[in-house]
Amino acid sequence: MNSSQTLVIKLGTSVLTGGSRRLNRAHIVELVRQCAPLHAAGHRIIIVTSGAIAAGREYLNYPELPATIASKQLLAAVGQSRLIQFWEQLFSLYNIHIGQMLLTRADMEDRERFLNARDTLRALLDNGIVPVINENDAVATAEIKVGDNDNLSALVAILADADKLLLLTDQPGLFSADPRTNPDAELIREVEGINDALRKMAGGSVSGLGTGGMETKLQAAEVANRAGIEVVIAAGGKPGVIGDMMAGASVGTRFHGQKMPLESRKRWLFGPPPAGDITVDDGALKAILQRGSSLLPKGILAVEGDFSRGIVVRIRSTDGRDIAHGVSRYNSDALRMIAGHHSQDISDILGYEYGPVVIHRDDMILC
C-alpha cells in the first residue's frame, strides 16, 4: 500500500439503502469497518454521504407529503441529524472521531468561503478526524444547490487536495451499454480521458431516492481528473472494495488524473458550478483560445443568469460550446449594459468601473 494518502469516499443513496426505502445498517457498518484500518494506517478519510432524505422519511415512518421542495427540506432537516448520529456511532466503535460539514454551492462559488471551508476540512484531517460531508439540503434551493453528491464529492476532493475519489454506487462501474437492458454490456476498466462517446454510455439512476446517475459521476470524474485526482467508480456492495482500491487492485472503472494537474487557484475556477453564461463572438473566442487573452466587454454577445461580481461564470461560443470558466469582475446586470461596448466606455455607461476587462486571463481556465 502507498504512503499516507487522502481519500474521498462518496456513498450514494442506493448504496446506503441497498435499493430499499430504509438505511441498510449492516452494509454501512461494513463500509466503516473497511475504513478503520486505512485510518489507523495514517490515511486521511473523508466521507461524502447521501441519505438524509431517506433517513428522515424512515424516522417519520414514511409520511404522506406533497412533492414539494419544502417537503424534501423537511425530510432532510429531520434526517440529517439521524444520519450524522448513525455515522458517529459506527466510527466510535473504532475510536474514530467524526466532524460534520454541510456545504452549499455558495460555499464553492465564493473564493473566501471556499478557502474557509478548505481550512476547516484540513484542520479536521490534521487532527485525525473523519469529515462527514453532505449538501445542506435543509436550506439549499435550486439556485444554491450543487445538485448532487457526485459533483459535491469532486469539489470536496479539490478542497482537500485529495489523491483519490471513490464513487460507490449500485453498479460495478461504467459499462459500454446499460447492463440492465443489454446482456452484452462490458465493464470499462480504465479511462484515460472522458469524451462524448463515454458520456453517451452513461445511464440514469434507477433509485427514486437519489439525484445522481452515471452521467453525474462522469461529470465528477472529469472535474477531479483535471485537478490530478484519480477517480474510481465501483460497486459499494463489493466486499473489501475500499481496501482493494487503495491497494491498487482492479476495482470498477478507474479514471486517471491529469499528469499535469491544475494549480490550486485554477482548480477552484473549474470546481464550482458556473453561476451564469457569457456568450462571446468569434473574435473574442479566437483571442481567448489562440492568444490566451482576457475577455473584454466588446466581445460579449449575451449574458444569461443573475450573478454578483467575483463569481465563477462560463464562457460559451455562439454554437453553444463551453470554452472557459472564469471570475467575472462585473455582475450580470452590469455586463448586459456594457456588452458589445469598448472598455473605455465602461465608466460612462455604468458610472463606475472595475477595470477594462470582464474576466482576466489569470482568473480563467479553458474547458
Curated annotation (Swiss-Prot):
It is an enzyme of class 2 (transferase). Substrate binds at S50, D137, N149. SMART domains: PUA (SM00359). The lineage of its organism: Bacteria, Pseudomonadati, Pseudomonadota, Gammaproteobacteria, Enterobacterales. ATP binds at K10, T169, D170, T211, G212, G213, M214, E215, T216, K217. This is Glutamate 5-kinase. It comes from the Bacteria. Its EC number is 2.7.2.11. Keywords: Amino-acid biosynthesis, ATP-binding, Cytoplasm, Kinase, Nucleotide-binding, Proline biosynthesis, Transferase. It catalyses: L-glutamate + ATP = L-glutamyl 5-phosphate + ADP. Belongs to the glutamate 5-kinase family. GO terms for molecular function: ATP binding; glutamate 5-kinase activity; RNA binding. NCBIfam families: proB (TIGR01027). It is found in: Cytoplasm.
